[in-house]
């Protein structure tokens, strides 16, 4: 299954996940998140997709399990400051992360993510740029130890 954590904020691009599910009816899509996601799907004319499961709010433990066992974690955000959920998915053992092809996501995830070109891809998980590097490399790049070292360097220079 493909897994996404969604809400109704426009920048999270929840409709892309639904269009992806419609384009790939043989795959399951699990969507966790608060708000009336199913109602929004109805408003978009995508309510009756048999391969979509709306999980509602899930606990941290449930989210970690879903991330660890998914085929890919989907993060088709329109804009984002950093985008922590895909990094969390990698830390939980997600096999692949698919993120929007935006400058921020490229800077954060580099070669470790698959990329969704939102300008040309209306919703197809198979039409993505595959990752060129092991996503586990992200855990080294953004470890607590590295973050602490960077902070210490900044404090020493201040």
Residue locations for each model-derived region?
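Carbohydrate transferase catalytic cores enriched for Leloir-type hexosyltransferases
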Residues: 1-158
């Amino acid at each position: 299954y493909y897994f996404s954590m969604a809400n109704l904020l426009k920048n999270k691009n929840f409709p892309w996940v639904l269009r992806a599910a419609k384009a790939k009816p043989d795959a399951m899509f699990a969507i966790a998140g608060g708000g009336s996601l199913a109602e929004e799907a109805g408003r978009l004319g995508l309510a009756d997709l048999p391969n979509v499961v709306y999980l509602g709010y899930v606990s941290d433990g449930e989210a970690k399990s879903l991330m660890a066992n998914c085929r890919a974690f989907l993060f088709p955000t329109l804009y984002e400051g950093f985008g922590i959920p895909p990094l969390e998915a990698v830390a939980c053992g997600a096999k692949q992360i698919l993120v929007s092809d935006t400058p921020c996501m490229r800077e954060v995830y580099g070669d470790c993510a698959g990329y969704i070109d939102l300008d040309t891809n209306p919703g197809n998980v198979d039409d993505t740029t595959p990752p060129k590097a092991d996503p586990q490399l992200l855990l080294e790049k953004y470890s607590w130890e590295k973050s602490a070292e960077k902070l210490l360097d900044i404090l020493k220079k201040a």
